[in-house]
Regions:
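Active-site pocket scaffolds in enzymes
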Residues: 83-86, 136, 140-142, 148-153, ...
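Histidine-centered copper-binding motifs that mark active-site loops
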Residues: 2-9, 21, 41-339, 346, ...
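Repeat-solenoid scaffold signature
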Residues: 336-338, 342-367
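Short, aromatic- and glycine-rich surface loops/edge beta-strands on solvent-exposed regions
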Residues: 176-181, 357-365, 549-553
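C-terminal motif of bacterial Sec signal peptides marking the signal peptidase cleavage site
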Residues: 37-38
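Short, surface-exposed loop/turn segments at beta-strand-coil junctions that are enriched for proline
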Residues: 168-172, 349-355, 542-546
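N-terminal secretory signal peptides
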Residues: 1-15, 22, 30-34
Length: 571
């Protein structure tokens, strides 16, 4: 699959800002550490001033290695024969830096691929050109950043405004991505097409002689529903219609979260499932390869669908990396579970296959991820007869088209990760509890919905501390006909973690058995799948930055309905 570089453009940042007419409408995250530190440590409240932004230009002292103008706007793309499809997409222009730092996926609604090296300084001038009612902000999923650069929904800007990101990349080599993160609107905006990849390289990775260039293939898995006119359907409405230009026809309640009667409640509870699998923005995707080794860098970019990845040949998958890093050494799995927001890095060796051979990457059947109301209701939100969550599906085809010789060998050692020891956690004997449950028809964390500017005392951690968190996906007796819950991919902003243990309630072990061997818990992660009745312990160190960060379910309809909380890192 060809990836095209976006070559340097003579347009300057000044031209970009003048052209938008936003010289006075520019917003950049201001330093808010002083505001946070002014909160008394004895106080029982950690209410944070709302939307602490200042209308000003970029920091003149910040000299970027890479500068990018990034616009979110409606456009049309060809997806199926016939009428073009209305989407919302990120478009980028390189203002400064290596031309190879910005690439496109041709004829796709997906945003650019940004490639950087660890230690580089990046400026992104993000402009919101979405329809009225669509506030937005960009979250750099997986990057460790200061709070005002992370994409917290409290910094969301309205249409016609610009937000300037300025940060140094401190991450290890890994596959990250970026997507919208406004409160109550993330699901719709991401579904409409707003997503891109952010790939970090470092000196350690460069020594490993992994496949690069045309042999390093990004794979973005999504599911979508199209109507007879090739238009995207989301919660019963077309993307781009007047109804959908303001929260998809949903009204916004006092909580700031979208609702639309029973339809809105069911969508937030079950999540949206699409009818067709899209790969890199296209259905019916075929990857043409040679008889050699490839590196497949796979993102689950779906709103709510979970995949159980496996080769049709029965060969095991060879994994070299996950969310936040390469692994310490390669590992093999017969299948890999990949929940929304998770990434996996695959060493794919086609050297023993003959030209003309075809194999496919499939999602195998699994059970137990939906246990609400005694039946699988996720398809209710699909705008049609979408495959149920856990259904077997073909994701994409791989066709061996030519012979090619190469000498790459799978390294026995990959990354030297700074792994933590569980006993070094300040709360090793009493992990911080994170309870996932159903409250009415809304999923909540520790019994609380999202509050934009609040972190409770029990949601406050100390900078440079090591902690254990224990996520419990509990049963919900008395809720929705004794609902036993759903799988929740939990994402933490601002930190990487290690998964140190898993266990499940005996009454839900049958479903868990269909997924447990596909967890890749080695390495550093930022998103973890938690099955109904499952208890997962995480280990992490809160370093580099203080401030307010979110943690939430990455089933985007759950997030939009309030399954998100803040945590505060305090110096």
């Amino acid at each position: 699959m060809p990836i095209k570089a976006i070559h340097q453009h003579p347009l300057t940042r000044r031209d970009f800002l003048r052209g938008t007419g936003l010289a006075g409408g520019l917003v950049i995250g201001s330093g808010i550490h002083s505001l946070l530190s002014s909160c008394s440590p004895e106080s029982s409240s950690t209410e944070i001033p709302q939307k602490n932004t200042i209308a000003r230009g970029p920091n003149a002292k910040f000299i970027p290695d890479i500068e990018i103008n990034l616009k979110a706007a409606p456009t049309t793309v060809p997806i199926l024969p016939g009428q073009t499809t209305q989407v919302w997409s990120y478009a980028a222009q390189l203002v400064k830096g290596d031309p190879n730092s910005l690439q496109t996926i041709p004829d796709s609604y997906l945003g650019p691929i940004i490639r950087v090296r660890k230690g580089q300084r990046v400026r992104v001038n993000f402009q919101n050109n979405l329809p009225q009612g669509q506030a937005s902000i960009v979250h750099w999923h997986g990057l460790i950043l200061p709070e005002e650069m992370d994409g917290h929904p409290r910094f969301a800007i309205g249409p016609g405004q610009t937000y300037v990101y300025e940060f140094e990349v401190i991450n290890r080599a890994g596959l990250n991505w970026f997507h919208p993160h406004p409160d109550g609107l993330t699901g719709q905006q991401a579904y409409a097409g707003l997503a891109g990849l952010f790939i970090v390289t470092d000196a350690e990775e460069a020594t490993l002689n992994l496949p690069t260039g045309a042999y390093e293939i990004p794979i973005v898995l999504q599911d979508r529903t199209l109507d007879a006119d090739n238009q995207l359907l989301y919660l019963g409405s077309k993307i781009g219609t007047p109804r959908n230009s303001n929260m998809g026809g949903m009204q916004q309640g006092n909580s700031g979260h979208s609702s639309n009667g029973m339809m809105g409640d069911m969508s937030s509870m079950m999540g949206f499932l699409g009818q067709k699998i899209f790969v890199n923005g296209k259905p019916n995707f075929t990857l043409s390869v040679a008889t050699r080794v490839y590196r497949l860098r796979i993102l689950n970019g779906s709103n709510s669908r979970i995949y159980k990845l496996a080769w049709s040949s029965g060969e095991p998958l060879t994994i070299i990396g996950t969310d936040g890093s390469l692994l310490t050494h390669p590992t093999k799995r017969k299948y890999v579970m990949l929940a929304p927001g998770e990434r996996i890095d695959i060493w794919a060796d086609f050297s023993k296959l003959k030209v003309g051979t075809e194999v496919s990457l499939n999602s195998l059947a699994f059970s137990g991820a939906e246990n609400v109301g005694g039946s699988n209701m996720g398809g209710m939100m699909s705008s049609g007869n979408a495959p149920e969550l856990g259904s077997a599906m073909m994701l994409f085809n791989v066709k061996i088209e030519r012979e090619e010789k190469e000498s790459l060998r799978l390294p026995s050692q990959l990354a030297a990760l700074p792994l933590l020891r569980p006993e070094d956690a300040v709360n090793a004997t009493q992990p911080r509890p994170i309870e996932l449950s159903l409250k009415g028809m809304k999923w909540v964390i520790n019994g609380q919905p999202f509050e934009m500017n609040t972190a409770l005392p029990q949601e406050t951690v100390k900078l440079n501390s090591i902690e254990q968190w224990e996520i419990v996906n509990k049963l919900n007796p008395g809720a929705m006909m004794d609902a036993k819950g759903m799988a929740h991919p939990i994402h933490l902003h601002g930190v990487h973690f290690q998964v140190i243990s898993r266990e499940v309630l005996p009454e839900l072990a049958a479903g868990w058995q269909t997924v447990k061997d596909g967890y890749v818990d080695e390495g550093l992660k930022d998103t973890v799948m938690v099955m109904p009745g499952e208890r997962v312990k995480l280990l992490m160190k809160f370093e580099k930055y203080s401030g307010l960060y979110t943690y939430h379910c990455h089933t985007l309809e759950h997030e939009d309905s309030g399954m998100m909380r803040n945590y505060r890192v305090k110096e």
